[in-house]
């Protein structure tokens, strides 16, 4: 068995980290340019590789007129920083729940956290709701977001590099036994610069600012700007669909509501973050920073962005089916997690009278009945099922935008207010590469987390964990994986 302090590589080690650090930002730009409101999703030129040329592709994508310099602007930078400043203000002035985290590895002491992201998001959404009531779909916030999407994406990416480089360099000022309780994450002390920068070196970097006080950067980024921004992006795409077609489709409303619930429920239960590996084990590096402020808001809103250009009509049966899938996933996720939490708190509760468990040498018990007798991480199965309704409303995605006056007919043809037509054409189902990427990625992420958890539990419980795995054979999906 490895010593606890012996780091091990994840995500392909230094080579994989290099690919992610420099490749993912390019991928996000490609996803936006390739699935667009100019020519189609994917852009028609991409469907014919034999005749593909840069000149042809450039004419079919929203490439800025200014060229590369158009990917950023000082105006967008100022407003993005204003958004972060607003989030900081709400963090500081609104009532908050003060919670102690888990005990740190080296000092054995907990850090204090301030949580009020739910109420802060509600305030921001309320303000936008009032603005929408006054201005309708032309509310300046909604039009500005969709008009400056590429600049917002690029500026957020640059901000990711700034934050992650700063936290990496700052981590070398940590001294053993420091009174600020600063620690280096176990996984971020390999000595390989690119890997440690990617995975995160300092466990819980904090900064003290005038008026705002002490801020845990990792927890703040995890629960605030990206998650709230995800909802705001979705709302801006709903408004765009209305401006484009004069109506709002049931599909975009269903996705926006489900995703808003997902975000708000997580923010309402913000204190639950403190037991997650993101907080207890992972340092703050490129991986978490990028995920929090770029990957989550911009990738996870792809479906609403798609539907803003090509509305899909589900009908009552379709809406009911999507809602049912979400509720099933939510039930599995919540029920299994609640069962585990209750067992940890009160293993002698009558609810566990007929359930089996393993008594470990550490003195704790591992539940091998109920949900946790079906799979070691059955909660991850529920979480993944919850992700499917984010993508399913886009159906067999893909569309081509045709000029006004084009002679084409069919039930799946949508006509914009400016006369342009949108039809699946040869693009379907290639658009699924864009709209279903989230669900595929989330499945990969959960499998990766399960592997990390398995390693951590093996280190923690030793032979007891091997016994547990013999009794509970399946990792996530009973009978399959």
UniProtKB/Swiss-Prot annotation:
Entry-linked InterPro entries: ERG24_DHCR-like (IPR001171), Sterol_reductase_CS (IPR018083)
Example of a GO biological process term: ergosterol biosynthetic process
Listed GO CC annotations: endoplasmic reticulum membrane
EC number: 1.3.1.70
Membrane spanning stretches: 11-31, 80-100, 125-145, 149-169, 244-264, 279-299, 313-333, 427-447
Reaction catalyzed: 4,4-dimethyl-5alpha-cholesta-8,24-dien-3beta-ol + NADP(+) = 4,4-dimethyl-5alpha-cholesta-8,14,24-trien-3beta-ol + NADPH + H(+)
Keywords: Endoplasmic reticulum, Lipid biosynthesis, Lipid metabolism, Membrane, Oxidoreductase, Steroid biosynthesis, Steroid metabolism, Sterol biosynthesis, Sterol metabolism, Transmembrane, Transmembrane helix
Membrane topology of the entry: Multi-pass membrane protein
GO MF term (any one): Delta14-sterol reductase activity
Pathway: Steroid metabolism; ergosterol biosynthesis
Signal sequence residues: none
Reported phenotype of the disruption mutant: Exhibits significantly increased sensitivity to amine fungicides, including tridemorph, fenpropidin and spiroxamine, but not to non-amine fungicides.
Function noted in UniProt: Delta(14)-sterol reductase; part of the third module of ergosterol biosynthesis pathway that includes the late steps of the pathway. Catalyzes the reduction of the C14=C15 double bond within 4,4,24-trimethyl ergosta-8,14,24(28)-trienolto produce 4,4-dimethylfecosterol. The third module or late pathway involves the ergosterol synthesis itself through consecutive reactions that mainly occur in the endoplasmic reticulum (ER) membrane. Firstly, the squalene synthase ERG9 catalyzes the condensation of 2 farnesyl pyrophosphate moieties to form squalene, which is the precursor of all steroids.
PANTHER family: DELTA(14)-STEROL REDUCTASE, DELTA(14)-STEROL REDUCTASE TM7SF2
UniProt record similarity statement: Belongs to the ERG4/ERG24 family.
Name of this chain's protein: Delta(14)-sterol reductase ERG24B
Organism: Gibberella zeae (strain ATCC MYA-4620 / CBS 123657 / FGSC 9075 / NRRL 31084 / PH-1) (Wheat head blight fungus)
